[in-house]
Regions:
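RNase H-like, Mg2+-dependent phosphodiesterase core
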Residues: 1-218
Length: 218
């Protein structure tokens, strides 16, 4: 039987980190992930999600492996099923001021602090701990290994995509509705033609684009 779109064949291991944390006595375990480190324009967005113990949904996976339609569908399901959800958004001006890594960690921190229920343990996608006192574990490629982090990746991705769709209406010449701020060839050519707008990241040197596009993965 073919797998459903986006389903994870390794789902049996997607809750391993959560189970270990529950066995260690933690009750509210939040997965934390971010979207938007690589784009030339727009904010970085993070989400934190606390799912019920033993929660199973075989379609929840790394948001990058899902279609936009599937992400929207799962976004609604996660909002319905989750114990708590928080989001953090750091704008372009702040990214340029403090750098993208610090902005990413700030967005993650804001997402955790926005949770209506305080988590007692965090599973964080990536290498870095975030600046909160809550016990935490960074997990490399966590959005493919932890259902909580995967859920957070979906919430963050859909949230950011919706923000970029709003910006598209303000700055249609850059086609943000399609590229979401990433450095596609079309986007780079638009910058060369029209210059930058207020949501472009000056610290990413978008004023000095060469003829070839900057390679980022949307």
């Amino acid at each position: 039987m073919p797998e459903r779109e986006g389903s994870n064949p390794f789902i049996s291991s997607m809750d391993t980190f959560e189970k270990i944390a529950y066995q260690e006595g933690y009750q509210f375990i939040a997965g934390v992930d971010e979207v938007g480190r690589g784009p030339l324009a727009g904010p970085v967005v993070a989400a934190a999600v606390i799912l019920p113990p033993d929660y199973v949904n075989t379609e929840i996976n790394d948001s990058k492996k899902l279609t936009a339609a599937k992400r929207e569908e799962l976004y609604k399901i996660i909002h319905k099923d989750a114990i708590a959800i928080g989001t953090g958004i750091v704008d372009t001006e702040t990214i340029d001021h403090i750098n993208i890594l610090r902005a990413t960690l700030q967005a993650m921190r804001e997402a955790v602090l926005e949770l209506p229920i305080s988590p007692d343990f965090l599973l964080i996608d990536g290498l870095h701990r975030i600046p909160v006192i809550t016990p935490q574990k960074p997990v490399v490629k966590g959005d493919s290994l932890s259902i909580s982090i995967a859920a957070a990746s979906i919430i963050a991705k859909v949230t950011r995509d919706r923000i970029m769709e709003i910006y598209h209406r303000q700055f249609p010449q850059y086609n943000f509705i399609q590229n979401k701020g990433y450095g596609t060839k079309e986007h780079c050519e638009a910058i060369k033609q029209f210059g930058i707008c207020k949501i472009h990241r000056k610290s990413f040197h978008v004023k000095n684009l060469k003829q070839t596009s900057i390679q980022f993965t949307p």
